[in-house]
Amino acid sequence: MTDDELPKTVFDDLFSVIESRRETLPDDSYTASLFAHEKGENAALEKLGEEATETILAAKDSDSAAIQAESADLIYHLFVVLAMEEITLDDLREELHGRL
């Protein structure tokens, strides 16, 4: 798939799916399992830390494919934590825009 074919809304689409899983908690969903985990938010925070470390290690090794894959995992788990805290992508956009 070329860059021109990729949807520009992929982050919004992903965040929507995460929010939907938070609301419906389907049994077969990894995302829902993070929201329903017995350790609560700590489970998602641990995964976020793990993915951050894996991203750093991939960058240290200059492994482009691993950097891409680990960054996707990092963003996904960050979005889960944002959803847990009821922080929207618009909130994040506003924060980033204020830093320009």
UniProtKB/Swiss-Prot annotation:
Instruction: State a single Gene Ontology molecular function.
Output: ATP binding
HAMAP family documented for this protein: HisE
Signal peptide limits: none
> What protein name does the entry list?
Phosphoribosyl-ATP pyrophosphatase
Any keyword Phosphoprotein?
no
Gene this chain is encoded by:
hisE
Subcellular location field: Cytoplasm
Q: Which GO terms describe its biological process?
A: L-histidine biosynthetic process
CDD domains tied to this protein: NTP-PPase_HisIE_like (cd11534)
In terms of InterPro entries, this protein maps to: HisE (IPR008179), PRib-ATP_PPHydrolase-like (IPR021130)
Q: So, what pathway does this thing act in?
A: Amino-acid biosynthesis; L-histidine biosynthesis; L-histidine from 5-phospho-alpha-D-ribose 1-diphosphate: step 2/9
Stated family: Belongs to the PRA-PH family.
Q: Which reaction does it catalyse?
A: 1-(5-phospho-beta-D-ribosyl)-ATP + H2O = 1-(5-phospho-beta-D-ribosyl)-5'-AMP + diphosphate + H(+)
- Give the enzyme's main class according to its UniProt record, as a single word: hydrolase
Which of UniProt's keywords are assigned here?
A: Amino-acid biosynthesis, ATP-binding, Cytoplasm, Histidine biosynthesis, Hydrolase, Nucleotide-binding
Spell out the disulfide connections: none
- The primary location reported for this protein is cytoplasm
Segments spanning the bilayer are none
Tell me the Pfam families matching this sequence: PRA-PH
GO CC annotations on file: cytoplasm
User: Which E.C. number(s) belong to this protein?
Assistant: 3.6.1.31
